[in-house]
Amino acid sequence: MANKLRNYTINFGPQHPAAHGVLRMILELDGEQIVRADPHIGLLHRGTEKLAETKTYLQALPYMDRLDYVSMMVNEQAYCLAVEKLAGIDVPIRAQYIRVMFAEVTRILNHLMGIGSHAFDIGAMTAILYAFRDREELMDLYEAVSGARMHAAYFRPGGVYRDLPDFMPKYESSKFRNAKVLKQLNESREGTMLDFIDAFCERFPKNIDTLETLLTDNRIWKQRTVGIGVVSPERAMQKGFTGVMLRGSGVEWDVRKTQPYEVYDKMDFDIPVGVNGDCYDRYLCRMEEMRQSVRIIKQCSEWLRVNPGPVITTNHKFAPPKRTEMKTGMEDLIHHFKLFTEGMHVPEGETYTAVEHPKGEFGVYIISDGANKPYRLKIRAPGFAHLQGMDEMAKGHMLADVVAIIGTQDIVFGEVDR
């Protein structure tokens, strides 16, 4: 009886350091060439959609931060926009500028993590160290406005939790920092938050150039990314790819331009688009997107400096009154009590609201039955569609290229598994 040749099957993850969380993939190999890549998901499923249906609209907000835990505030933004659309809430213009500014800060945070970890997985260690240096400063912005460095819960239906602070947290002296280092670290933290943001926007483009020096013309980086994971424009659209995964294939689609929300229609920025649809082009798109985000942040900062005003709606059925008013007015106290015990009542209806998330189109679909909780909440996670393309993108490549493809998809399992 003749022996039958069989392909070799291996498990990739979920413990693998390049699996970006808890991805388990069953790879079928012919030698070292991939015949089939089968992603198994669900290991980080926490029932977010169902949990949100048991909470009031305000209580459900912090769950959004924990979906894509690298792009926290953009998740919040999509949810808040959906609730505002259903309830017909008018958001003050200053709050819209603050939201857009922090959405772009979040985009830079995401791309630094994406590029840094992608390079690290492939074998270039320096990039992630540079990326985390800049991420540290941006996370200080999160901390200054919300008190948290990751799960901010800063956006609210109707605006934002509070206005921008007049100061930035400073480094304190320790046995690891001498007086000279401490002075350098705190130099840009002497003024307001907007001063800190402007100083960051001045020096960050040079830091992007440094990252590019490490990778863009690096021979090994190009060998590992050029021609790997190619997706044609037609196939990208058929697969439901969005964000950099779609733009890297040459399709100019960005929700901020095609269906503008908040104040994006007042912003001057460009959409970087790839040509070849491979890992290298997607990397270049992310690099350029960070530069465009800096442009948007500068425009927001400029506007916020000269336009004071309210940062949350004055309709107390949806947002709490100021604490000073609450301590003197009985009606304000009642509004506060009702809002945090019973929650806001959103009129009957349904809506799908999408934002341009750093990873693609992040959508929130809400059905309201007029109660204080969503009747149904559905989340459209961009990474879910991208991961489905894994088999097609990896087929015919070598085992080592799987790591490059996972990195270019920029997968985070909080949103994929929900």
From Swiss-Prot:
Its main location: membrane. Keywords: Cell inner membrane, Cell membrane, Membrane, NAD, Quinone, Translocase, Transport, Ubiquinone. Its EC number is 7.1.1.-. Signal peptide: none annotated. InterPro entries: NADH_Q_OxRdtase_suD (IPR001135), NADH_UbQ_OxRdtase_49kDa_CS (IPR014029), NDH1_su_D/H (IPR022885), NiFe-Hase_large (IPR029014). Gene3D superfamilies: Cytochrome-c3 Hydrogenase, chain B (1.10.645.10). The keyword Ligase does not apply. The keyword Glycosyltransferase does not apply. One of its GO terms (molecular function) is NAD binding. It is an enzyme of class 7 (translocase). HAMAP family: NDH1_NuoD. NDH-1 is composed of 14 different subunits. Subunits NuoB, C, D, E, F, and G constitute the peripheral sector of the complex. This is NADH-quinone oxidoreductase subunit D. The gene is nuoD.
